[in-house]
Amino acid sequence: MSSVNPVAAVEIEGLTVGVAARTLVRGLSMRIRAGEAWCVLGSNGAGKTTLLHTLVGLHRAAAGSIRLWAKPLADWSIEDAARIRGFLPQFIHDTFGASVLDLVLMGRHPHLSRWHWEGAADRELARAALEALGLAHLAERDITTLSGGERQRVAIAALLAQAPAILLLDEPITHLDLHHQIVVLQHLSALARDQGKAVIFSIHDLNLARRFATHALILMDDGIVRHGPAGEVMNAPVLSAAFGYPVLEMQAGERTIFIAE
């Protein structure tokens, strides 16, 4: 297991985020450290995607600050930021065909010197990412021939090949069957636990979130955010309030599960 860096991977102070006249996050202050896997929970329209976009730098906060490894987000160059943090968007659009391997190799571009092509080490990392997600047999397939679930896993593989210290993923298990949902979340959890990555992902499945996340950030009404260790903040009263529907908490052996009433 990797040692924990005393400096927070992501440090948020007084963050307020909104869209139009609506405040989604109000005055959020928190730290995300290396070795932690955070799930972002909330109802549709609560602001999960907007918050992730803000942490990446794609959406301007109304107030507050974000630091990556103690350095203000705005002070990172595009090139340097791409080396230390990676982002998987919720929607992916392909405008042209390419092989699966070539697309995953695109994740290595931030690490290449100008005018240099990918080398053997880059190809090894790309193939390892495909292998980790059960995609090695599709390496030479054209991405336009893939199913939605296969294409989603290829996008995640490209993020893995990028090898950032901070991974932000917007609904990474969308389009995936149960088996591949587990494979992806197991791998993300292992990246945090074994390699000291900071992992932040939005998700709708409460039980998978509770199983694989070490910490949870829950978007409530009126910009209120609950955050902390998943076992503490993920409980029936909080989740019922967040989703506007009664949620029951039960035990299945040593595992906590949530069901709708």
Where are these regions (language model features)?
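The feature captures the beta-strand-to-loop junction immediately N-terminal to the Walker
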Residues: 41-43
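Helix-to-loop junction immediately C-terminal to a conserved catalytic motif
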Residues: 56
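Conserved ABC transporter NBD signature motif
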Residues: 64-72, 81
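Conserved ABC ATPase "signature" region
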Residues: 105, 120-138
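Conserved ABC ATPase signature
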Residues: 142-146, 150
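Catalytic Walker B motif of ABC-type/P-loop ATPase nucleotide-binding domains
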Residues: 167-171
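H-loop (His-switch) and adjacent beta-strand-loop-beta switch element
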Residues: 216-229
